[in-house]
Amino acid sequence: MPARALLPRRMGHRTLASTPALWASIPCPRSELRLDLVLPSGQSFRWREQSPAHWSGVLADQVWTLTQTEEQLHCTVYRGDKSQASRPTPDELEAVRKYFQLDVTLAQLYHHWGSVDSHFQEVAQKFQGVRLLRQDPIECLFSFICSSNNNIARITGMVERLCQAFGPRLIQLDDVTYHGFPSLQALAGPEVEAHLRKLGLGYRARYVSASARAILEEQGGLAWLQQLRESSYEEAHKALCILPGVGTKVADCICLMALDKPQAVPVDVHMWHIAQRDYSWHPTTSQAKGPSPQTNKELGNFFRSLWGPYAGWAQAVLFSADLRQSRHAQEPPAKRRKGSKGPEG
């Protein structure tokens, strides 16, 4: 009887405990980065907690799992060929450092914000380690076009379906298939809008395909978007607002999270309520009941004058705290008592 061919074993998500030889670490205390506060907080929509305190997602067209101990950020990268399984290289780790902008020292920023803002000082005691990701401009732009009138869970689903439909397949881990983010060319195709509507993007489908075409046909392609990193905040914000589906809030998100504009302060209903509730701020136009282009600029200027050139980072701390407290209030009491700090160390 002929021997049965052995099927290749499917690659699975790793944990630090199960495969320590395939991980590398970056010195980074929790006070400088809290993965559980940063990755699910509405900056990027592509990270999942696949195992307790182990976050898996796509960064620079590679699939990673990240976890942390008290003083270290631990990283493992998955390559398509199992024979190439090895710990991340120094160049690969540098991509992680840049993604989390670890050259920016949070402790100094928190100290400054706390010294000028007593409310921030109070909130920050429980929400150390909130920092801004430096995302790919294309991924950030189209993710936040999907964010219009939406919540984090629904945006996450839309972005995932967008990547599955138009992004390159990278690797399968357990029963999860990971895709890279689609290119401008892939999103500019003639059938894209109709396909995205079938995937549940609604009116945002038109904005996705129209913005991709506008960048390619009217603005000069990817280089135009990337060079906005060198422009002033005001110039970059104005340029982004030309694109279909990009208003003041979405433009501020892209400026802050992809274009190196730490002073950008995205204003949504959360920040509007925080400003009124905790800072007694009111727009000069007393009739204004919520965010608008004019009031967004006014509130952004208020926070910039209070917090300084990294105002967008300070805003992210308050936003994450408000988001976490809202989720906590909605959880059943039994779940609230559970936590996933991650591996000890």
From Swiss-Prot:
<dbReference type="GO" id="GO:0045944">
    <property type="term" value="P:positive regulation of transcription by RNA polymerase II"/>
</dbReference>
<dbReference type="Pfam" id="PF07934">
    <property type="entry name" value="OGG_N"/>
</dbReference>
<feature type="binding site">
    <location>
        <position position="268"/>
    </location>
    <ligand>
        <name>8-oxoguanine</name>
    </ligand>
</feature>
<feature type="binding site">
    <location>
        <position position="270"/>
    </location>
    <ligand>
        <name>DNA</name>
    </ligand>
</feature>
<keyword id="KW-0234">DNA repair</keyword>
<feature type="binding site">
    <location>
        <position position="266"/>
    </location>
    <ligand>
        <name>8-oxoguanine</name>
    </ligand>
</feature>
<feature type="compositionally biased region" description="Basic residues">
    <location>
        <begin position="335"/>
        <end position="345"/>
    </location>
</feature>
<dbReference type="GO" id="GO:0034614">
    <property type="term" value="P:cellular response to reactive oxygen species"/>
</dbReference>
<dbReference type="GO" id="GO:0006355">
    <property type="term" value="P:regulation of DNA-templated transcription"/>
</dbReference>
<keyword id="KW-0511">Multifunctional enzyme</keyword>
<dbReference type="GO" id="GO:0005634">
    <property type="term" value="C:nucleus"/>
</dbReference>
<keyword id="KW-0456">Lyase</keyword>
<dbReference type="InterPro" id="IPR011257">
    <property type="entry name" value="DNA_glycosylase"/>
</dbReference>
<dbReference type="GO" id="GO:0009314">
    <property type="term" value="P:response to radiation"/>
</dbReference>
<keyword id="KW-0227">DNA damage</keyword>
<dbReference type="GO" id="GO:0005654">
    <property type="term" value="C:nucleoplasm"/>
</dbReference>
<dbReference type="GO" id="GO:0006974">
    <property type="term" value="P:DNA damage response"/>
</dbReference>
<dbReference type="GO" id="GO:0008534">
    <property type="term" value="F:oxidized purine nucleobase lesion DNA N-glycosylase activity"/>
</dbReference>
<dbReference type="GO" id="GO:0016607">
    <property type="term" value="C:nuclear speck"/>
</dbReference>
<feature type="binding site">
    <location>
        <position position="319"/>
    </location>
    <ligand>
        <name>8-oxoguanine</name>
    </ligand>
</feature>
<comment type="function">
    <text>DNA repair enzyme that incises DNA at 8-oxoG residues. Excises 7,8-dihydro-8-oxoguanine and 2,6-diamino-4-hydroxy-5-N-methylformamidopyrimidine (FAPY) from damaged DNA. Has a beta-lyase activity that nicks DNA 3' to the lesion.</text>
</comment>
<dbReference type="GO" id="GO:0045007">
    <property type="term" value="P:depurination"/>
</dbReference>
<dbReference type="GO" id="GO:0032357">
    <property type="term" value="F:oxidized purine DNA binding"/>
</dbReference>
<dbReference type="GO" id="GO:0000978">
    <property type="term" value="F:RNA polymerase II cis-regulatory region sequence-specific DNA binding"/>
</dbReference>
<dbReference type="GO" id="GO:0006285">
    <property type="term" value="P:base-excision repair, AP site formation"/>
</dbReference>
<dbReference type="GO" id="GO:0005739">
    <property type="term" value="C:mitochondrion"/>
</dbReference>
<dbReference type="GO" id="GO:0034039">
    <property type="term" value="F:8-oxo-7,8-dihydroguanine DNA N-glycosylase activity"/>
</dbReference>
<dbReference type="GO" id="GO:0032991">
    <property type="term" value="C:protein-containing complex"/>
</dbReference>
<dbReference type="InterPro" id="IPR012904">
    <property type="entry name" value="OGG_N"/>
</dbReference>
<keyword id="KW-0539">Nucleus</keyword>
<feature type="binding site">
    <location>
        <position position="315"/>
    </location>
    <ligand>
        <name>8-oxoguanine</name>
    </ligand>
</feature>
<dbReference type="GO" id="GO:0044029">
    <property type="term" value="P:positive regulation of gene expression via chromosomal CpG island demethylation"/>
</dbReference>
<feature type="active site" description="Schiff-base intermediate with DNA">
    <location>
        <position position="249"/>
    </location>
</feature>
<feature type="compositionally biased region" description="Basic and acidic residues">
    <location>
        <begin position="324"/>
        <end position="334"/>
    </location>
</feature>
<dbReference type="GO" id="GO:0004519">
    <property type="term" value="F:endonuclease activity"/>
</dbReference>
<dbReference type="InterPro" id="IPR003265">
    <property type="entry name" value="HhH-GPD_domain"/>
</dbReference>
<dbReference type="GO" id="GO:0016363">
    <property type="term" value="C:nuclear matrix"/>
</dbReference>
<dbReference type="GO" id="GO:0045008">
    <property type="term" value="P:depyrimidination"/>
</dbReference>
<feature type="binding site">
    <location>
        <position position="287"/>
    </location>
    <ligand>
        <name>DNA</name>
    </ligand>
</feature>
<keyword id="KW-0326">Glycosidase</keyword>
<dbReference type="GO" id="GO:0006979">
    <property type="term" value="P:response to oxidative stress"/>
</dbReference>
<dbReference type="GO" id="GO:0140078">
    <property type="term" value="F:class I DNA-(apurinic or apyrimidinic site) endonuclease activity"/>
</dbReference>
